[in-house]
């Protein structure tokens, strides 16, 4: 079963008639499925067209490449019938207009857009033109006809041939005037109506043009059309007249050029062999008859056509190279602009980050400065208070003098109060005990001083009121010092250990000095 197809299996196992019935049923099922698929495709296309959406592609919307791995040949050969294959094979893609059009009715611009994008061989291009039945007139839009005829006076066959040829050319001209490009819709050829006289246009040679010399090498070689003549006995005598007519005629300068590239053909013709070189060869034509002349003329036309194609090909290569350079420069410019924008974004980000850090540092510096200023203010206040206390003590000493007490108590007080500073406790945890001791000693001294002052008031009643006031002031100052001791304790917690200890030691020294000054006995 694996080596046989389904059709062969049914035919061998069931026979011909069951095979016919089964395949008829399968075909009806397939037709129904195709009708459903076609209706859905039509409905989707109508929806896309109604809402101005992009029309879905027939090949992209298939799920074969997702569900099953398919060979690309399946889509282009097996899935398309013979009739549509013929239609598709006659179409070509225009890279300019992004359209599929009939290749036999495409203009030069649309044709060259696909014929020279990847193919660089001249022979391939020539074969393509031959396949498409394109003559030289259809490839060159601005051509003008220059007939090379070999007439003989009094020849009726030539006159009949000329009349038939005129009728044929007129009909072809009318047809070509109406022919338009299948892609862009432009007229493929616009031939100007040229008035023709009786016999002078055919038999007579035109006078040389005084404006353009023969050595200027500005011939429009693409405007030559060769007319075949029948080979008979009368035509054998036309050799001399035809050569004279060709040598005496001066080619006319034709303006315009390649409309697709916008460059005149005369510019490309300057780099190619000239008609003057080939005209010298025609003087050496053999005297064997008209057949050799026909062959020589045909070879000249072929060579000229080949040279025109080569020049066009070189121009197209140059333009393609120019386009590549432009695209490369555009890509480089885009990359440079992207790099510049990225660098600018990075620079802006770095600047923003630097500004943020700078603001943070400024705020931190301001906060630290405020803290330092507040601490300096507190220290200044404490110093001022200490100075005020010292000034008050000095005033008291100057006004009342030193208080007297017993010798033993004074010595004991001095021994206690004149201890060195290094003997005082340093640990911050014992500051409260020191302050309490100082408070008790100060109260004791105040009490002793009060007793001493009362005794002195008994002796000196005149100074009683003054001493009471001074004692009350000293008591208030001691209470203030006690309240400030708590504040100093809080400050010691905030400050560093070394600074707090130093301040407390200094305060304790000042308090001891104050007490010693207050209770110091007079030695005089």
UniProtKB/Swiss-Prot annotation:
The chain crosses the membrane at residues 20-40. Pfam families: Zein-binding. Its main location: membrane. Probable membrane-anchored myosin receptors. GO terms for molecular function: myosin XI tail binding. Residues 299-397 form the GTD-binding domain. PANTHER family: MYOSIN-BINDING PROTEIN 2, MYOSIN-BINDING PROTEIN 5-RELATED. Keywords: Coiled coil, Membrane, Transmembrane, Transmembrane helix. It is found in: Membrane. Residues 462-490 form a coiled coil. It comes from Arabidopsis thaliana. It comes from the Eukaryota. It is a single-pass membrane protein. This is Probable myosin-binding protein 5. One of its GO terms (cellular component) is membrane.
